[in-house]
Amino acid sequence: SFLSRDAGLRGPEPKNNLAVGVKSVIGLDPKVIEERFQVKNGEGAAYAVVGDCTKGIGGGGFLYTNIDSVSAGVVLRLDDLERSGESSSQLHDHFLTHPVVSPLLAGGELLEYGCHLVAEGGASMQHDLVAPGLLIVGDAAGFTLNTGFTVRGMDLAAGSALAAAKSVDLALRNHDVG
């Protein structure tokens, strides 16, 4: 993360350990989501997509349902993206307009759009996690896993945030701060 680098906890990260994620959140009626993704009320669907969605750039696409929206986007290796001359927003739009993806999102309203730099170096990216007044968690701490078949990050971010919160709570209750 920029924060941990600026705090002196780690040096610059090689581009082959980084990816950029571009995501849109598309609002849809829950009944439409259930019908299009063939899920029942209270269920969800998640898809990891490879192939044309990245035009040969390392990475992939994703779709996952929420109660009244669908999150859809791409994650692209930064070094491959830079060499390609494509932009992350162009590839994001290419994925969302793909003939298989666009019918799933048709008629929806764009609620959110965002980009995020993602660490993909796994254990090789982990570094010191604490400094005075600073506690690094989630992907900023290098808690990610991408083997191509398994992609994890949100669960590790949530778990590390919970562990950090418990540690801070304990330190505050024991007056062990300073």
State where each predicted segment sits.
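Gly/Ser/Thr-rich active-site loops/lids in small-molecule metabolic enzymes
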Residues: 15, 19, 153-166
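FAD-binding beta-loop-beta segment adjacent to the flavin cofactor pocket
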Residues: 116-148
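Flexible, glycine/charged-enriched surface loops at secondary-structure junctions
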Residues: 103-114, 175-178
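Active-site proximal loops enriched in glycine and acidic residues that flank catalytic Cys/His/Asp
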Residues: 74, 138, 158, 172
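Active-site-proximal substrate-binding core of FAD-dependent oxidoreductases
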Residues: 144, 162-178
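Predominantly flavin-linked oxidoreductase catalytic cores and closely associated redox partners
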Residues: 1-106, 143
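Short, solvent-exposed loop/turn segments at secondary-structure boundaries
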Residues: 83-86, 148-152
